[in-house]
Structures are given as structure tokens and as C-alpha cells.
A protein has these predicted regions:
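Structural recognition of an alpha-helix C-terminal capping motif at a helix-to-coil junction
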Residues: 28, 42-49, 62-74
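A short pre-motif secondary-structure segment
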Residues: 120-124
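Sigma70-family region 2
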Residues: 8, 35, 46-63, 82-83
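Short amphipathic alpha-helical boundary/capping segments
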Residues: 7, 15, 105-114
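Arg/Lys-rich amphipathic alpha helix in sigma70-family domain 2
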Residues: 59-60, 69-89, 151
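DNA-recognition helix of helix-turn-helix
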Residues: 138-162
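A short, charge-rich alpha-helical start-of-domain segment used by transcription regulators
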Residues: 2-28, 41, 52
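Internal acidic/polar
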Residues: 78, 83-111, 130
């Protein structure tokens, strides 16, 4: 009887609900980190497979979200360092870029940033996380997150100015 009550109290953490609520966020973060749709799909699947193993230990909805993002970062890091990944050659999925179409895409410019800056920008501006939340998720110092955001903004500013000339 006690375990049934515990499951009802942890309704927010049920894998199906977590997937419906956070799958898009997890996928977008994976895509920002890998720049590849199929790798992002693999990471999304791996994240929720890992989550299914531990979902009953979640204490609050904030813990669910933080854990999913942390697993996403770890999975994307693992993918980049795997021997399989090192032996593969990626295809350019954007065969027609926005530059060829005569347009300017801020997302294209963000995707050109180094991964640490790209991740911080995505979590801060696209997901709406505070500096402290990003620091907790990435397990880095809040001042490091601020530095990443400042440098990313400077790089984007220079790119935009160069494109305007």
C-alpha cells in the first residue's frame, strides 16, 4: 500500500509525463550540442532509457528537468568521445544554407559557436534558464557560465557586424 501511495505522489516524474513534457527540450539541447539530427534522436532515446531506471527517486519536477538535461549533456559528451563517432564522417544536413537563400539566420550563427558557448546560449536564451540553473546542470561555476554567455554574445555581435558590412 505504501508503494502505491509513493507512485501517486510522484506522478510528475512518471516517464510518460516526463517524455511528453521534456522531449522537445532534450532533443533541442542534443541537437545544439551535436549539430546532427540522427545523433540527437539517439541521445533522446538514451536519455529517457536512463531516466526510466531512476524516475522513482525524483523529489520534485525541478529535479526531473535538471536530471534530464544533465543526462543529455553527458550523453552528447559520451557520443563525441566514442570510438564509433571518431571513425565516422558526417554529412552536411543543411545542403541549402540560409546564406545561399540570401537570408540571415541567428540560429545558424549560434550553431557556429564553440560547443560550450552554444550550450550556454541555448539553455539561457532558448530554454530560459538562469545562470545558476545552467551552472547546476552543467556542473560548472556560475561565473564560468557568465563568461561563456559574454563571449558568445561578443562573437555573435562581431559576426552580425561583419555580415552587415
Amino acid at each position: 500500500m505504501n508503494s502505491i501511495t509513493e507512485v501517486k505522489n510522484k506522478d510528475f516524474a512518471m516517464p510518460e509525463k516526463a517524455f511528453l513534457k521534456y522531449a522537445d527540450t532534450v532533443y533541442r539541447l542534443a541537437f545544439v550540442r551535436t549539430k546532427n539530427k540522427s545523433d540527437s534522436d539517439d541521445i533522446l532515446q538514451e536519455v529517457f532509457l536512463r531516466y526510466i531506471k531512476v524516475w522513482q527517486k525524483m523529489e520534485s519536477e525541478e529535479h526531473v528537468k535538471a536530471m534530464l538535461l544533465r543526462i543529455t549533456v553527458n550523453c552528447s559528451n559520451s557520443l563525441k568521445t566514442s570510438s564509433w563517432f571518431k571513425k565516422t564522417e558526417g554529412l552536411n544536413e543543411n545542403l541549402i544554407s540560409s546564406e545561399e537563400l540570401g537570408g540571415f539566420s541567428l540560429l545558424d550563427e549560434v550553431m557556429k559557436l564553440p560547443i560550450k558557448y552554444r550550450t550556454a546560449v541555448h539553455l539561457h536564451y532558448y530554454c530560459g534558464y538562469s545562470v545558476n540553473e545552467i551552472a547546476d546542470t552543467l556542473k560548472i561555476n556560475p561565473s564560468t557560465v557568465k563568461t561563456h554567455l559574454i563571449r558568445a554574445r561578443a562573437m555573435l555581435k562581431n559576426t552580425i557586424k561583419a555580415d552587415d558590412l
